[in-house]
Amino acid sequence: MKVVYWFTYVMAFVFLVGETARRGIGYFSVNATTMIEDYLCGAFLLFAAWVWSKGYDIAPKMMAAAWAFATGGMFVPFAAHLEAWLRDETFRPDHPHTDIASIILKGVILAVCLACLVVTLRHNNNKPSRA
């Protein structure tokens, strides 16, 4: 579970800093929803890691909820981009279907989130250890 704890910080950084670095702060004027979703996800993961580090009783549930939010938040972007590539059709001009690297990156992020969710749920009955 310690690996998941540290991955929580890494993925929070990916959601918070990665989204801004990839799109720029000006993307808020294009699609604020996707930016806010990623920022909320990063903040939720940071909060869950903080609660876990303090050893609060709610920590396992908070960690599971944060990873579930992250997994759900990554499913649609990954699946939509993959579908666009499979259909050979760009659905949104800011997401060209030929951008295979973006599909792979989204798939890796989704896989990490899902793996951390599964580990967290399997570990959910145990009290958090101070990391």
Feature names for model-found ranges:
Residues 1-131:
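Topology signature of small-to-medium multi-pass alpha-helical membrane proteins
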